[in-house]
Amino acid sequence: MTEQQKNDAAPQSAQGDLHPENEAQERKGLKVPRTVWALGFVSLLMDISSEMIHALLPLFMAGPLGASAVLIGLVEGAGEGAALITKVFSGAAADRFGHRKLLVFLGYALGVLSKPVFALADSVALVFAARVSDRIGKGLRGAPRDAIVAAVTPKPLWGEAYGIRQSLDAAGAFVGPA
């Protein structure tokens, strides 16, 4: 069997794997949409602010607020648990009702509004409320945001678009605690 016959017999997805120039041709002239860059920069800023707080939160709770290690763990666990549970439902809700932008907006708004509460907190209960609110916001925005990235990006650029958004997110996580 000749190379051409193998290519003709291969499924379309495999042909792209055999011929990288096909992918390059599909991508020619395509750009990652501004929406992806905007979501990436918002993720960068949110991660910077979240990681600044997250790095110092245990010290704040243990020091001025007098929280025990167990209580600090409960606050962190409740926050992360709230994020994980919310992620499941936000993705399904976004798909079912089609309100991706609204859920992303609400998720970021909840995160932004919870940040000043940490600075104003004079009790572990207030820190708990802020942490759970912040993490619910993270859970709300994650899946719908990724769906928006897919919806606005041409399919040949999906990898690049997700890479850009995630790289900016990771840069924020790196810079935040510094």
Residue positions per predicted region:
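Structural signature of the two symmetry-related core transmembrane helices
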Residues: L102-P116
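Residue-level signature of mid-helix packing/kink "hotspots" within the transmembrane helices
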Residues: E80-V88, A173-F174
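Helix-loop junctions at membrane interfaces in 12-TM secondary transporters
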Residues: V117-A130
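Helix-loop boundary and gating motifs at the non-cytosolic
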Residues: E26-E80
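Cytoplasmic helix-loop-helix junction between adjacent transmembrane helices
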Residues: A130-A171
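Glycine/proline-centered helix-kink
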Residues: A55, A173-A178
